[in-house]
From Swiss-Prot:
Residues 1331-1343 have a biased composition (Acidic residues). Residues 540-627, 929-1016, 1112-1199, 1239-1298 bind DNA. Keywords: Coiled coil, Developmental protein, DNA-binding, Homeobox, Isopeptide bond, Nucleus, Phosphoprotein, Repeat, Repressor, Transcription, Transcription regulation, Ubl conjugation. PROSITE patterns: CUT (PS51042), HOMEOBOX_1 (PS00027), HOMEOBOX_2 (PS50071). The modification Phosphoserine is found at S427, S761, S904, S1054, S1064, S1265, S1332, S1468, S1496, S1506. This is Homeobox protein cut-like 1. It is found in: Nucleus. GO terms for biological process: inner ear auditory receptor cell differentiation; kidney development; lung development; negative regulation of transcription by RNA polymerase II; positive regulation of dendrite morphogenesis. Residues 828-852, 1365-1378 have a biased composition (Basic and acidic residues). Residues 393-453, 509-546, 644-666, 680-702, 769-871, 884-923, 1032-1105, 1207-1242, 1307-1488 are annotated as: Disordered. Residues 393-405, 436-447, 853-868, 884-906, 1032-1044 have a biased composition (Polar residues).
Length: 1515
């Protein structure tokens, strides 16, 4: 440190030395200059001045000298010090040496201490060493001791080992002896076991032989019983035939008798007395003959009954025997099982096998001659086969014998029958008829019964009524009948070919439903060769039960064919299998093995096999696919799809039912002739050997003749169907009656039989599905039927159809309810608009729905169908086009209302088919979006959990989410969210919804679903679905829906009596949303929290603390509640305080009285409730927790009474309209749960230039977009809510002027004649008046892009509103006409706006949809007589008489105002309802969204109300 300081000091000293040297030089220089200057001064200055200055200069000189002397001395001193310091030697090396010495001294100290320690340790070690020396001696002694111990141990161990060895040897000898003993005992036991085994084997053989005997006996008995039953049945059939013949004869005799009676009466009138005797004689002879016939009939009936009784006895006996045999069999089986269990593991069958082989070689090889095959068959099988062949021979001989003896026996009995007028020869039963439902009347006029057909319905339905009951014939009856007829044909062959019948009778248990052997198919190849019948697939399934189908192979082949010919699975499923695309995809992708399929599950594979068997099927299907691709929009396409849809259960062969629309009568005739050939072949194969050739030729001639007659009828029917199609004139009622018999006779049972009775009753068509196509007056449908019918028509079915026709005709006359859209030729452009949607919708609808085109006007159609049909039609009236469609709100109130088409107020407007709402369509995902998620693993469970949370948090229902984001139905969404599949198990299509969910969570998709935050305007809603959704979610659950403000209720001063208000209000109760529900007792709606949109944005609960959270969030976060306890407490509070459930429901829960009553009476447990279902209980709990709950409800009740009295008073004092409304109750007092919001809202007054600007904007765009509204607001320095309200009020005023004029015109009796549908279509009830812009910011629901789309109320074409020029023309009077004060006391108009005279608007503007009214109170300062009230007072039932808002009522009485009086202006007084101010609540987006939804409902109700004839309104 010192050396550093010294070096520093040296440097400083050096610097100062150099500075001093420099200063010395400088001072010398300056001194010289001073001397020179003084010299010059002496020279230049005058002397007197020098004298004056001399002393001063001298003193300066002296001072300078002294200073210089001082400085020199100082410098000298410094230099001496400096020299000395320079001479001092460098101290650094000395310091280093000192430091080293210090270190050495330190080390010395350390070494001394260490030495001391070492000395100490050395002393210790020395001591230890001494001790160790002493221990060595002891160690040696110890070692010696150890050696001794070891020696002793060794000796002990040896002795112990010897002892043990001895012991073990003894044990071994003993065990060996025992082992020998056990061996002896086991050998003896083994011998016993072998002996037992032999005895058991012999017992087993015995039981097997017994079992075999039992089986053979059982088979013999079953075959014998089958033979007996068959004989009984043949007797029964013959008896039936005779009975029928007798009945026919009896009928002819009765007719003769009646005709004779008639003639005798006539004769008696002419000649009374002389002919009495003859008359008596003739009558007596006829009566005698009739009595004989009746006796014969009675005898035949007795025979039939006796045969039936014997048959039932036989059945019972056989059943009891079978059960006994089965019991025996079970017993034997159980013993057999026990024996087998004993034999397991011990049996040795080699010897038995040898014996069997020798037996086979000895017994069966020569007799059967089967060669190598028999060697593989077991002995039992060979014995069974032998026995079976013997039994079958025995059975055939017995049948032929009984046949011969039976015919011989009957010859004597049937002798009188041969003398009858028309004896029927006992011809053999016919072959299986083409149409299973027809009566087999061409040979013996009765059904054929066979053992295979003895089903449960044998006696009940078929025997009791020989003609099949059409409407109730189910699949089972058909199936059994078909099998009966099949078996009958087989038996008839069996009778002829006794030798070849060995395979017909199965020796297995007797089955009623199936033929176990497939051989009948081989024997009668014509069975499958016939044209398709509706039940052929079922019969094929039952016949070919035995044959197994390789399902995987068939599915593979079908897929190959579909891919090869580019046929879609939907088309294939629709036309071939009768299944949906999803089912087809499932069957083809994962075909189940044949043995795991049910009978119904096997059907599609039979159909697919049939489909693959013929190339024509594939080509026909390909042509259909091509046609559908070429013109998918054709409306008629659906008609051709529908007919096969009803028959698509038939089978895989589709060529017979797929017909192009162009095919004409030539093809029909061709197909008929082909069918005739097939019939002939069938008859030839079925013809027994005994029948003569002449009879068969006669039959075939008859068949061909009937077929050709049928063809002629078909062509006539086609012509008749085509004629009306060429011109729009409808088919009249007579035409229908001409056409329907032909069609019905053509296919009496062609489609009925496909459906079971339940399905037929569910379809809303009378008697049978095919009647719809036959009876519909539609050209394409008739044409289609005409082409399809020949393929399904057997000869002789026309007679059978007559019975079907009568009930159908009566049904048609009564009025049947068709669910087909009415295709109107008047509006082709509309059809083009909707056809693509309809075809889409139709593909998803059930195949049972009938649709056909119709050129018939509504009135005639309604005459045909009657009131029930029209009522049905109005139920089925969904309007897919209008976002404000009223269809979903319409409620049928009976035929008395004028809502059916024939008495609708729009006689001239054509009925246009409204498509069912199309499936929710969402824009497809981009390839980029697919690629991001498709190949990465997504946790579906976590994803669905997040989605559910987000949906619950934002209060979005699953239906909206499904429609807007996923493009799925609510059910699919619910299923997906509750049970998500793992990502790895999903197909590409199955992954798409999850990708969409992920994109939605990330904010890349479907943002229109979420409520928009922070916007002044609520979201623009574009579809009915999105508008209606919040209703279904809980009817604006987070809005104070039930507390409908003044804009939702009739004005308190409206001139209505209470009884009339009851009419309108009771109808409102039927509204789907409680938002617009009012009391049934004529009270006004609950105005609590007057428009709660301002005072309480989120819930109608009277709790200010919860305003931050929406009710959905409260429900989602609430713990499990005791629903029973809550309801019990609520009921107690209500009853104790005498509060009604209606008031509580509307004010607190937002529900109707009925819903509240249901909730309180039958509360569900919390865990079984959905989020929506939990909401009322959360509201109840919050209400119960509120200390002021009862007081608030009591206040509401009191105010309701006051308002009711006020209304009655105002209805009485209608003639003084200028009574100031300031005396009205301020509904915010006590009604609002937040008592701090009690200030009335100030009136907004617009300047004239602001009004002019807004009017100009209105003329350009009456429904401005949110962007336009914001621009206007910023330009005019107004609030956006003010601009929105101004537009809304202005539109309402213009519409009201038109409305009042129309009412006035109607009151003069001219409305009915002049009013056009378009002018009446979209008229709305008036809304708030004037330019007052206070109130809640309403949300105008606009079409996208700001287009003004108007929808006609009857579903006509959407029109764009009229051009601005027309609008300008319409609105000019509004600016020119002067306001007239209502009475002398009314102050002038503050805002200075002119009233407008009523003037009709252009049609386009009239048709524009009504604006969405705000939820605000009516404009402040309105006069009650013209003050606008909510359009909600209009009810949803279109035909209902309704008491409208005040404008309508005030304009109606002709005494109060002249017909063309200008509309009266509102006064400047405050409105009846004060609006509380709430700054914070204003921007709540949830409130706005709910308000928008409410407004849309109100708008739809306006439309529904304005559709009616004004003249029909009752006041």
């Amino acid at each position: 440190m010192l050396c550093v300081a010294g070096a520093k000091l040296k440097r400083e000293l050096d610097a100062t030395a150099t500075v001093l040297a420099n200063r010395q030089d400088e001072s010398e220089q300056s001194r010289k200059r001073l001397i020179e200057q003084s010299r010059e001064f002496k020279k230049n200055t005058p002397e007197d001045l020098r004298k004056q200055v001399a002393p001063l200069l001298k003193s300066f000189q002296g001072e300078i000298d002294a200073l210089s002397k001082r400085s020199k001395e100082a410098e000298a001193a410094f230099l001496t010090v400096y020299k000395r310091l320079i001479d001092v030697p460098d101290p650094v090396p000395a310091l280093d040496v000192g430091q080293q010495l210090e270190i050495k001294v330190q080390r010395l100290h350390d070494i001394e201490t260490e030495n001391q320690k070492l000395r100490e340790t050395l002393e210790e070690y020395n001591k230890e060493f001494a001790e160790v020396k002493n221990q060595e001696v002891t160690i040696k002694a110890l070692k010696e001791k150890i050696r001794e111990y070891e020696q002793t141990l060794k000796s002990q161990a040896e002795t112990i080992a010897l002892e043990k060895e001895q012991k073990l040897q003894n044990d071994f000898a003993e065990k060996e002896r025992k082992l020998q003993e056990t061996q002896m005992s086991t050998t003896s036991k083994l011998e016993e076991a072998e002996h037992k085994l032999q005895t058991l084997q012999t017992a087993l053989e015995k039981t097997r032989t017994e079992l075999f005997d039992l089986k053979t006996k059982y088979d013999e008995e079953t075959t014998a019983k089958a033979d007996e039953i068959e004989m009984i049945m043949t007797d029964l059939e013959r008896a039936n035939q005779r009975a029928e013949v007798a009945q026919r004869e009896a009928e002819t005799l009765r007719e003769q008798l009646s005709s004779a009676n008639h003639s005798l009466q006539l004769a008696s009138q002419i000649q009374k007395a002389p002919d009495v005797a003859i008359e008596v004689l003739t009558r007596s002879s006829l009566e005698v003959e009739l009595a004989a016939k009746e006796r014969e009939i009675a005898q035949l009936v007795e025979d039939v009954q006796r045969l039936q009784a014997s048959l039932t006895k036989l059945r019972e006996n056989s059943a009891s025997q079978i059960s006994q045999l089965e019991q025996q069999l079970n017993a034997k089986n159980s013993t057999l099982k026990q024996l087998e269990e004993k034999l397991k593991g011990q049996a040795d069958y080699e010897e038995v096998k040898k014996e069997l082989n020798t037996l086979k070689s000895m017994e069966f090889a020569p007799s059967e001659g089967a060669g190598t095959q028999d060697s593989t068959k077991p002995l039992e099988v060979l014995l069974l086969e032998k026995n079976r062949s013997l039994q079958s021979e025995n059975a055939t001989l017995r049948i032929s014998n009984s046949d011969l003896s039976g015919s011989a026996r009957r010859k004597g009995r049937d002798q009188p029958e041969s003398r009858r007028p028309g004896p029927l020869p006992a011809s053999p039963p016919p072959q299986l008829p083409r149409n299973t439902g027809e009566q087999v009347s061409n040979t013996n006029g009765t059904h054929h019964f066979s053992p295979a057909g003895l089903s449960q319905d044998f006696f009940s339905s078929n025997l009791a009524s020989p003609s099949l009951p059409l409407a109730s014939t189910g699949k089972f009856a058909l199936n059994s009948l078909l099998q009966r007829q099949l078996m009958q044909s087989f038996y008839s062959k069996a009778m002829q070919e006794a030798g070849s019948t060995s395979t017909i009778f199965s020796t297995g248990p007797y089955s009623t439903n199936s033929i176990s052997s497939p051989s009948p198919l081989q024997q009668s190849p014509d069975v499958n060769g016939m044209a398709p019948s509706p039940s052929q697939s079922e019969s094929a399934g039952s016949i070919s039960e035995g044959e197994e189908i390789d399902t995987a192979e068939i599915a593979r082949q079908v897929k190959e064919q579909l891919i090869k010919h580019n046929i879609g699975q939907r088309i294939f499923g629709h036309y071939v299998l009768g299944l949906s695309q999803g089912s087809v995809s499932e069957i083809l992708a994962r075909p189940k093995p044949w043995n795991k399929l049910t009978v119904r599950g096997k059907e599609p594979f039979h159909k697919m096999k049939q489909f693959l068997s013929d190339e024509q099927n594939i080509l026909a299907l390909r042509s259909i696919q091509g046609r559908q691709r070429e013109n998918p929009g054709q409306s008629l396409n659906r008609l051709f799809q529908e007919v096969p849809k009803r028959r698509n259960r038939s089978e895989g062969n589709i060529t017979t039912r797929i017909r192009a629309s162009e095919t004409g009568s030539d093809e029909a005739i061709k197909s008929i002739l082909e069918q005739a050939k097939r019939e002939l072949q069938v008859q030839k194969t079925a013809e027994p050997v005994q029948t003569s050739s002449t009879s068969s030729s006669g039959n075939s001639d008859d068949a061909i003749r009937s077929i050709l007659q049928q063809a002629r009828r078909e062509m006539e029917a086609q012509q008749a169907a085509l004629d009306p199609a060429l011109k729009p004139a409808p088919l009249s009622q007579p035409d229908l009656t001409i056409l329907t018999p032909k069609h019905l006779s053509a296919s009496p049972m062609s489609t009925v039989s496909t459906y079971p009775p339940l399905a037929i009753s569910l379809k809303k068509t009378p008697a049978a599905p095919e009647t719809s196509t036959a009876a519909l007056p539609s050209a394409p449908a008739l044409k289609k039927e005409a082409q399809d019918v020949p393929t399904l028509d057997p000869p002789g079915s026309a007679d059978a159809a007559q019975g079907v026709l009568r009930p159908m005709k009566s049904e048609l006359v009564r009025g049947s309810t068709w669910k087909d859209p009415w295709w109107s030729p008047i509006q082709p452009e509309r059809r083009n608009l909707t056809s693509s949607e309809e075809t889409k919708a139709d593909e998803t609808t059930a195949s049972g729905k009938e649709r056909a085109g119709s050129s018939q006007p509504r009135a005639e159609r309604s005459q045909l169908q009657g009131p029930s049909a029209s009522a049905e039609y109005w139920k089925e009236w969904p309007s897919a086009e209008s976002p404000y469609s009223q269809s979903s709100e319409l409620s049928l109130t009976g035929a008395s209302r004028s809502e059916t088409p024939q008495n609708s107020p729009l006689p001239s407007s054509p009925i246009v088919p409204m498509a069912k709402p199309a499936k929710p369509s969402v824009p497809p995902l981009t390839p980029e979006q697919y690629e991001v998620y498709m190949y990465q693993e997504v946790d579906t469970i976590e994803l669905t959990r997040q989605v559910k949370e987000k949906l619950a948090k934002n209060g979005i229902c699953q239906r909206i989410f499904g429609e807007k984001v996923l493009g799925l139905s609510q059910g699919s969404v619910s299923d997906m969210l509750s049970r998500p599949k793992p990502w790895s198990k999903l197909t590409q299509k199955g992954r798409e919804p999850f990708i969409r969910m992920q994109l939605w969570l990330n904010g890349e998709l479907g943002q229109g679903v979420l409520p928009v935050q922070g916007q002044q305007q609520g979201p623009v809603l574009h579809s009915v679905a999105s508008l209606q959704d919040p209703l279904q979610q809980g009817c604006v659950s987070s809005e104070s829906t039930p507390k409908t403000s003044a804009s939702c209720s009739p004005a308190p001063e409206s001139p209505m009596s209470s009884s009339e208000s009851v009419k309108s209000l009771t109808e409102l109760v039927q509204q789907p949303c409680p938002a617009i529900e009012t009391s049934k007792e004529g009270k006004p709606p609950e105005p609590s929290d007057p428009p709660a949109s301002d005072s309480q944005p989120t819930t109608p609960l009277p709790l200010s603390g919860h305003s931050a959270l929406s009710i959905q969030e409260l429900v989602a976060m609430s713990p499990e509640l005791d629903t029973y306890g809550i309801t019990k407490r609520v009921k107690e509070v209500l009853t104790d305080n005498n509060l009604g459930q209606r008031l509580f429901g509307e004010t607190i829960l937002g529900l109707t009285q009925g819903s509240v009553s249901d909730l309180l009476a039958r509360p569900k447990p919390w865990h079984k409730l959905s989020l929506k279902g939990r909401e009322p209980f959360v509201r109840m709990q919050l209400w119960l927790n509120d200390p002021n709950n009862v007081e608030k409800l009591m206040d509401m009740k009191r105010m309701e009474k006051k308002a009711y009295m006020k209304r009655r008073h105002s209805s009485v004092s209608d003639s003084q309209p200028c009574e100031p409304p300031s005396v009205g109750i301020d509904y915010s007092q006590g009604a609002s749960p937040q008592p701090q919001h009690q200030l009335k809202k100030p009136r907004v007054v617009l300047a004239p230039e602001e009004k002019e600007a807004l009017k100009r904007a209105y003329q350009q765009k009456p429904y401005p977009s949110p962007k336009t509204i914001e621009e206007l607001a910023t330009q005019l320095n107004l609030k956006t809510s003010t601009v929105i309200n101004w537009f809304h009020n202005y539109r309402s005023r213009i519409r009201r002027e038109l409305f009042i004029e129309e009412i006035q015109a109607g009151s003069q009796g001219q409305a009915g004649a002049s009013d056009s549908p378009s002018a009446r279509s979209s008229r709305a009830a008036p809304s708030s008046e004037g330019d007052s812009c206070d109130g809640v910011e309403a949300t105008d629901a606009e079409e996208p892009g700001g287009n003004i789309v108007a929808t006609k109320s009857q579903g006509g074409l959407a029109e764009v509103a009229a051009a601005p020029a027309d609008r300008e023309e319409a609105t000019q009077p509004a600016e020119k006409a002067k306001a007239q004060p209502l009475c002398s006391g009314t102050p002038g108009q503050d805002d200075g706006e002119d009233a407008s005279r009523p003037r009709p608007l252009p049609e386009g503007l009239a048709d524009a949809p009504a604006p969405v009214p705000s939820l605000a109170a009516p404009a402040a300062g309105e006069d009650a007589a013209t003050s606008a009230t909510a359009p909600a007072t209009a009810t949803e039932a279109p035909g209902a008489a309704r008491a409208g808002p005040a404008e309508r009522s005030s304009a109606l009485p002709s005494t109060s105002a002249p017909a063309n009086a200008p509309a009266r202006r509102p006064s400047s007084l405050q409105s009846l309802f004060g609006l509380p101010e709430a700054a914070g609540a204003r921007d709540n987006p949830v409130r706005k969204k709910k308000a928008a939804n409410l407004n849309s409902i109100i708008h739809r109700l306006e439309k529904a109300a304005s559709r009616e004839e004004p003249i029909e309104w009752e006041f």
